[in-house]
Amino acid sequence: MPEPGDMTARPPSDDAPQGDAGPLTPGQQAELAAANERAQKILKAGRVATFNGWTIGTFGVLSVLLGLGSLTALVVGAGLLVVAWNELRGRNMVRRFDPAGARLLGRNQLGLMGLIIAYCLWSIYGTLHHPSETIRELEQVTGGPGSVTHLVAWGYAAVIVLSMLLQGFNARYYFARVAQLESYTRSTPGWILQLQRATSGLRQ
């Protein structure tokens, strides 16, 4: 029986009798500290996803607000908002040590890559075949027919390459965390996982 006024209960342990209650033993404290240390590398993926989610969401909102007269901008903005939502949803799953969260984040980055590539290809097509009035005016000033058009097209091509590198790296980073999460959940006592999941909302 715990002493009167002692409200600290020992979490259920895979190695301890279920009816036992009381403060954590030194052994359990050491076990919890070691588990928290091992979890830091995994939880870093959640912090990366937080940054990605809010950054992508900001661009999505701006695309929608600034592109109210453009169907392309609205579609891209809506796509970015979906990606941002999935990024934050995957972040929450990773914080609960759910391997499916890292898998979702990896696929989400591939989806973002596809969205960016599709937008850039569409923009290249429009630039080459239906150049805007601004591009035509610039070419009249520079005196080089097609020079600005091709420069803009090459700019979009560079964005495609950059997205393949950046989103490809992020996807690989997230997918690598799937095996780490699976290993962590297998090797960590159930009471520690339960405690960590219960406090997942407190993490930054």
Regions found by a protein language model. Give the residues of each.
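Topology signature of small-to-medium multi-pass alpha-helical membrane proteins
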Residues: 2-204
